[in-house]
């Protein structure tokens, strides 16, 4: 079920505080590290770079206009795909 239209998009208050501070200090090129993967990307985030925590490291995410309305967690994968292991019988030949 999707979020009600009556409600505004969710964005953690501390993320908004960090963004407002970066804009006020004119630090638009610095990385803003956040843990809130469930926060929605808003219009005022365009052009900023966020470090989204994936459980181990901060993955840099540069926000552009195509990302508005999506969540930060979509751009920071938490699992690494290592591929399938090949069949040992085939490799012996």
Curated annotation (Swiss-Prot):
Q: Which GO terms describe its molecular function?
A: rRNA binding; structural constituent of ribosome
Q: Which GO terms describe its cellular component?
A: cytoplasm; small ribosomal subunit
Q: Which UniProt keywords apply?
A: Ribonucleoprotein, Ribosomal protein, RNA-binding, rRNA-binding
Could you name the domain of life of the organism this protein comes from?
A: Bacteria
- Supply the SUPFAM superfamilies for this chain: Ribosomal protein S19 (SSF54570)
Kindly indicate whether the keyword rRNA-binding belongs to this entry: yes
What this chain does, per the entry, is described as: Protein S19 forms a complex with S13 that binds strongly to the 16S ribosomal RNA.
Q: Which family does it belong to?
A: Belongs to the universal ribosomal protein uS19 family.
The protein depicted here goes by the name: Small ribosomal subunit protein uS19
Which species does the entry assign this protein to?
A: Ehrlichia ruminantium (strain Welgevonden)
